[in-house]
């Protein structure tokens, strides 16, 4: 039934109580939609003109419907006046190609040990296959995405990472493990990113960077996203994962945690494997930056919009120690 007919019928009644949900065929979804839209308004007003750095990875990349949902969300953010910068991983694709050449991977604290042969595969997969697929999806959704890697225009300069560990806890002697061509962000060319934002493009960045003597490094995408968020004074860093968020020792989701809480989760071994660089990145962004950091479940369709524009949100937000 059309809205004007509903109102007309109501005017013929002795007691005008207004149109009811039943008069719309009992479809409460219409009303819920308008409620959600009105709920978005204060967040849109708050973040218009701000920069969001979004680390994209996990199931949101491997599931095509989730990938298309993510692309639409990125375009919507841009249309709302927010400047999204996408940094992507691609671990599953890298693993798949390494398996084809019978190459095994070793991970230490969530970082892939990278020799010369592995580096070639990483650069080929991330900068070629994965990066271009993401830009194509965003462009198909109506955006203007441009694919980059850390090497382009010296966007991100990296330095070599060395992992220290104690072989024997009794003698307290630390040893250095060579991670190969694994780097960490050192400097960011913010001028290029500001230029891209002003040109109405959406940058999509692969975490392959160069360092001293033009050596190429494989850099963890979480660390790259964090470095960009700090360098650009981004309002938010958002990391998509394959889990619901950060959990405590009992597996309960933590909707908000302080920097101290995050540090304790790492020290106590509650956070492990790939969650370690994610939390470390969030800690650094909150300590050194101006915004908040979020770890959210990329398996949920339109999870970005749920986290950013609804009262309850989803996942885990990392805030300063004064929460």
From Swiss-Prot:
GO cellular component labels: cytoplasm
Keywords of this entry: Amino-acid biosynthesis, Arginine biosynthesis, ATP-binding, Cytoplasm, Kinase, Nucleotide-binding, Transferase
Plastid is among the record's keywords: no
Pfam families the record matches: AA_kinase
InterPro entries: AceGlu_kinase-like_sf (IPR036393), AcgluKinase_fam (IPR004662), ArgB (IPR037528), Asp/Glu/Uridylate_kinase (IPR001048), NAGK-C (IPR041727)
Cross-referenced PANTHER family: N-ACETYLGLUTAMATE SYNTHASE, N-ACETYLGLUTAMATE SYNTHASE, MITOCHONDRIAL
Family of this protein: Belongs to the acetylglutamate kinase family. ArgB subfamily.
Protein name: Acetylglutamate kinase
